Amino acid sequence: MQHLKRIGRLRCSAVMTIALLQLVLVITAQAEAPWPDPERFRAAIEAFESEDREAPPPSGAIVGTGSSSMRFWSVGDRFASDLSPLTVINRGFGGSVIHDVEIFLEPLVLKHQPRAVLIYEGDNDVAEGVPMQEILASYDRVQSRLDQLPSPPRVYWLAVKPSLARWSLWPQMQAVNDGLKERASRHPRITFVDVATPMLNEQGLPREDIFIADGLHMNAKGYDLWREALRPVLLPAELEFERAP
């Protein structure tokens, strides 16, 4: 009889141990967002650092960072010309998500001691299946670090854009935009810039004439829309801080 009780206690203990291990695994899985490995951008970050050593950009400029929509804006020096006469630095890196900006915030942004920061992310994040709350939480952590700087910069969050290639994901992207807009409304130094609405036609669908062949990245007409959405917001707020040559 005692032998059977002992076996019963052992079985009960084993079941409890397995249940505890399963609980730990569930909690761990919930705590870790399904972010891509940031190390895939190590070479790109090192290239930026090399560029900074060879031609140090000015401090106190406006730094733009984010995924390929930000990176391709610099092709042909268009980023600088579209936002002229403001002094800008483009640190976009294609394929990135907001977690990558969070991990590499120092070499991408902080080292430049910017007076303002433009961020475009959320596009790849949603496509990667990262939950909205995780995306917004990473934005919050980035903002928290910026807020802790001796001279906290003004921050401009660009809305996640609609596209032909990712139109099926637009509801999730809109939810991210709503979250960003709500956060910006409560923060004195964050401005949400709606670059998304001008990219939709009268039927509320993505305009077909503003994308290159992949249906995801913008052509010159697409960047025209971004310029016209951003300049009226950025210039009145930033021109007075522009340093005289």
Stretches with model-predicted labels:
Residues 13-26:
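Bacterial N-terminal signal peptides
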